[in-house]
Amino acid sequence: MKQLPLSKLQSLFAAVSAAQKLYIPADDAAGQASFTVWQEGIALTKKLNTVRSAKDLFFPQVENLVGFRVTGRQLDLVETRDPAEPFVLFGVRACDARSFEILDRVFLSEPQDTYYAARRAHGTVVTLACTRPEETCFCPAFGIDPAAPQGDISCWIEDETLFWQANTEKGEALTAKLPMLEDTDDAAVAAQQEKTRALLKKLPLAGLDLSAVGAGKTKALFDRPEWKQLSESCLGCGTCTFVCPTCQCYDIKEFDSGRLVRRFRCWDSCMYSDFTKMSAGQPRPTQLERFRQRFMHKLVYFPDNNDGCFGCVGCGRCLAKCPIHMNIVKVIKTLGEEHA
């Protein structure tokens, strides 16, 4: 365990960014927190979490794949992908850190997504423990401990001190470049963890029951009449999918500038009526079917195919951002009523 006075945090950021790009959660002009390239004077946000997740750094909303240049009858491939460079992602919360493991199951399984894999290989994740969990948080339901976040490096802030623990070879390599960190014990961290875990037990969503969902529940849940009632209030705006740290759906499009055809991918949403649109039509033409697909995927289909691992991390972003307050917790509770 290492430590650093919080007053020297900017010096730490400067040392890290001297060798590679550093992203930290910082407030923008509108007061919204997002992961931003650190520059001198940019301060770490005091908000619990960013509006959009840290997923953006590994799976960007828009990403170049390849280009084509046509000269007469000749077609040439042009490398247009953004080059992967080493970077450090500081201040990732435990929920977002778990989301990387979920995305890994999708993009790093064979055949590997080389674009995602390159970013994962070049990124060093520094997590930051939560001390003030909010009412929308329910990550413990999925076995996540926000007081002990996992990452290449885990950090805690307590008594105006940053505590720093390297967990992987990447973490050790970065730590070795930061001589301002001093050895210490973990007594202060252990005390903070105890306080945070006590707070978690008092949250409104503490003890959220997941017994009605999970692997093997397709037959029991697919034709439940509650889907109609739940889906009727949904606007189909897709906000939940764009703030979600685990959604991984995308579309592939092409843009012709006249000199170069650029093929790129961009996030898509299963809540949209033209999602996976094909010449024969869309596979889920109604709002009910699309709504059911979104939540069945996170709560049943993904666990079915991934050793029981849910496709949700309990970050609470969909609870905070849905304009009509329809969210995954309401779905879980509604489906669990008959089960209980």
Regions found by a protein language model. Name each.
Residues 231-251:
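Basic (Lys/Arg-enriched) interaction patch that binds polyanionic ligands
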